[in-house]
Amino acid sequence: MQALIETFFARKEEYLQALIEHMQLSFISLLFAALIAIPLAIYLTSHRKLAESLLQVTGIFQTIPSLALLGLLIPLIGIGRPPAIVALVIYALFPILQNTYTGLTEIDPSLEEAAEAFGMSKKEKLFKFELQMALPFIISGIRTATVLIIGTATLAALIGAGGLGTFILLGIDRNNLSLIFIGALSSAALAVLFNYGIHWLEKANGRRLIIGGTILGLLLGGSFFWNQQTSSKEKQLTIAGKLGAEPDIIINMYKALIEENSDIQVTLKPNFGKTTFLYNALKSDEIDLYPEFTGTVIETFLKNPPQLDNQPQVVYEAARAGLKKQENLTLLKPMRYENTYAVAVKRSFAKAHQLKTISDLQKISNQLKAGFTLEFIDRQDGYKGLQEKYHLNLNVQSMEPALRYQAINNGEVNVIDAYSTDSELRQYDLVTLEDDQALFPPYQGAPLIKTATLEKYPELAEILNKLAGKISEEEMSEMNYQVNVEGQDPSIVAKDYLKEKNLLK
C-alpha cells in the first residue's frame, strides 16, 4: 500500500492528464453513440424488418476483438484519438440501440390508440409520451454502454490516444504492480461513479437534468480548457517515446537539453506506443520528434532497404539518406551505444550447456522453448533470420516484452530475445549469446524529426547533436536499471547523466 501511495503522488500530474484523456474519450464516444443509436431506434420502430437485421449487425460488432478493431481502423483513420473514438462508438451502439428500440416497441398499444383518437401526430406521440415511457430503457442502455466504454478505453493507450491505459501498459512493461493498480482501479472507479451518476439521472426531472447537464458540460469544457492551456504556448514541441524505460530516459534528455538551450517548451508523451505507431504519428504531425534506431529504419521503414555490411556508420548514413528521400524526415546524429537485438539465456543454462554463440543453440534446439516478442518473430532481423542464418526452428511462444523476462526467470521458457541494454539482463542474471553469423544490424539511437520542424526550429539540430557519440552501452544499461529495478524517476536519471557529462547546468 505504501508503494502504491508513493507511486501515485510521484506521478500525480501524469495521472491527472491520463484521467482527463480517459474522460474525454469516454464522454465523446458515449455522446456520439447516443446521437446515432437513439434516432436510429426511433426510425426502426416504423421499419421492424430492418430493425432485426440492424440489431444483429450491431451485436456482431461487439464480438470483434477490440485490438483487431483498432488494427483495422489504423490504416483508414490513423492513430491517436480518432480510431479510438470510432471503436468505442461501435462497441457502445448495440446496448443503446437495443434498449431504446425495446422501450419504444413495448409501449402498451392501448395508449397508442388513445393518442391517435386524440388526433396526435407521430411526432407529438413521440415527444409527449413515447420517449418518456421508454426513458428507463434508454438510460439502462446508456449505463451499460458507459461501463463498456470506460473499460475498453484503456486499450486506447496502445495507439497513442492516452487515458488510464497508459498506467496499465507502463506497469506491465516495468513489472510495476502499483502502476497497474492505479490504472485499473481508477478505470473501475470511474465506471462505478458514472454508472451511479446515470442511475441518479434515471429518475429524471427538470432540475436533475439541468444539474447533470451542467456537471457534464463543466467536466468536458474544463478538460478541453486544461488541454488548451497546456498546449497554448507559441513555441511548443511534442516529443514521444516508445514503451519502456530507455525511450523515457532519452526523451527526458531531449526535453532538458532543448528547454535549457532554447525558448521552446517541450511536451512529452512517454510510452506512446510501439514502433509503427510513433513513425505514423510523426508523419501525420501528431508528434514532432522521437528517438529511433538505425537498424529499425533499415529493416522496417525503408521500402527498398539496401544490402549493407554491419558497420554502424554505414548503416546510419543509409538510414539517414533513405528517410530523407522517402519521407523527407531527418535522422540526426546517433548516440554511441547500440541497443541491438540479442538472444539471451540464463547464465546457469549457458554454463550447463556450454553456450557462447547463437550457433551453439543448434546442438540443443530440441530442448529449447523460446519466448519472443511478436515484433521479433515477424522481423527478418529477428526469428526469421534465426531460421535462415542459424537454421534454428524452435518451439516459440509470443509474449509482451516485459513478460518474456518473467517467463525465463520462472523457467517457463529457456531462451528469449532481448535488447543489449535491457536492465533485466542484469536483474535476472542472463547472458547474451554472440551473434557469430552477424544477423543483427547496428541499432544506434538517434533523434528522428520532420525536416519541416527542423526548418522551423533550426537550433534543434545543434542542441540534440550534443548527445551524438555519447552514452555507452554500460551507461545506458545502468540508467535502465535505475529506473526499472530501483524505481527512480526517468527525468531525474536523465538530468543526472547530463549534469555528470557537463551537458546540463
Curated annotation (Swiss-Prot):
Residues annotated as domain ABC transmembrane type-1: 19-198
Subcellular localization(s) per the UniProt record: Membrane
Domain of life of the source: Bacteria
Primary localisation category: membrane
Record GO terms (molecular function): amino acid binding; transmembrane transporter activity
Transmembrane regions listed in the UniProt entry: 25-45, 59-79, 84-104, 148-168, 178-198, 209-229
GO CC annotation: ATP-binding cassette (ABC) transporter complex
Membrane topology note: Multi-pass membrane protein
Annotated segments matching region Ergothioneine binding domain: 231-505
Keywords: Membrane, Transmembrane, Transmembrane helix, Transport
GO biological process: glycine betaine transport
Family in the record: In the N-terminal section; belongs to the binding-protein-dependent transport system permease family.
Subunit structure: The complex is probably composed of at least an ATP-binding protein (EgtUA) and a transmembrane protein (EgtUBC).
Physiological role: Part of an ABC transporter complex required for the uptake of ergothioneine (EGT), a natural low-molecular weight (LMW) thiol antioxidant. Responsible for the translocation of the substrate across the membrane. Also contains a C-terminal periplasmic solute-binding domain (SBD) which binds to EGT with sub-micromolar affinity.
PANTHER family referenced in this protein's UniProt entry, alphabetically: GLYCINE BETAINE/L-PROLINE TRANSPORT SYSTEM PERMEASE PROTEIN PROW (PTHR30177), OSMOPROTECTANT IMPORT PERMEASE PROTEIN OSMW (PTHR30177:SF4)
Name this protein carries in UniProt: Probable ergothioneine transporter EgtUBC
Native source species: Enterococcus faecalis (strain ATCC 700802 / V583)
Gene giving rise to this polypeptide: egtUBC
